[in-house]
Amino acid sequence: MYSTKCTNFFLEIIFYVIFCTLFLLVLEKMSKLLSWIVIVCLFVFAISSKCSAQNYGINVPITGSMDVVLANSTQDQIGLTSTLCIYYPKAADTEIADPEWKATVTQLLLTKGWPTTSVYLNEYQDLVTFSNDPKLYCDYNIVLAHYTNDVALDISELAEFLLYEWLCNPMDVTLYYYQQTSEPNKWIAMGTNCTIKVCPLNTQTLGIGCQTTNTDTFEILTMSEKLAIIDVVDGVNHKVDYTVATCKINNCIRLNPRENVAIIQVGGPEVLDISENPMVIPKVSRMTRMNWKKWWQVFYTIVDYINTIITTMSKRSRSLDVSSYYYRV
């Protein structure tokens, strides 16, 4: 008979064999499970990255054997999410003489992707009136300015006025002297009749080439204008004189370009390129010219090229709820 020690030895061998077998089985199962988990994670990661991929090209053609150019299907339809204002002079409505012409224009713009509820045709009396109180409330604003010899300068200053944001404060010339401190610092005069006179002062507040007590000796900068952007020598105090009853003048700082505004000059020998004005920095390209024919032809052309015009602009991105001294024009 086997001894007790021998029996225990065999039992220990059987126990370790069973234990090792079970351990190997569990280890094999766990390794398979971990492998499956790793494989599934890699598969899900690879698939999700492809699904969320975005084609950032704009109207990029697909080259190869295809015969057509396919536009990017993710490109936004601007007209569906934006508002468009077109400002036109009263003379246009008078010439067209059709009570339904606005409806016709909006229906034509619908064919270009602009819903009738997103388009507003706003009339202004003349450039002078419009420049004194421009209301540019849409995401995209297009101003039609009819060129005539007597309003050439008005268009030029209106363009500079509208294509930039201005931070302005009213000037009290009866109490204070004023100076311009930098290139963006201008004085803007608006009203029915603005004649601006100035007398530059030295460090002792004595007039340079003029008498501070005699406005007849002041230098005349503007004469009977409705809108004037005034530039004087920086860093020099000036005594200013103007007719308060028919004009108001503000001390302004030119800020960022108003990229949601474009001006179309209708008629004239050539477009008034305000970017050539040394007062205008940086250069702008949102002003163009259209041949003058009839107002119906003007609006047909606007409709035909509306989306091309919009591409030169940027949608309004900031609120109009600002202080009364901040002219978002």
UniProtKB/Swiss-Prot annotation:
Subcellular location field: Virion; Host endoplasmic reticulum lumen
Binding site residues for Ca(2+) 2: 180, 231-232, 234, 304
Residues carrying a glycan: 72, 193
Binding site for Ca(2+) 1: 98, 209, 217, 219
CNP motif as annotated region, ranges: 168-170
Note: Some rotavirus strains are neuraminidase-sensitive and require sialic acid to attach to the cell surface. Some rotavirus strains are integrin-dependent. Some rotavirus strains depend on ganglioside for their entry into the host cell. Hsp70 also seems to be involved in the entry of some strains.
Protein name: Outer capsid glycoprotein VP7
Species of origin: Rotavirus A (strain RVA/Chicken/Ireland/Ch2/1979/G7P[X])
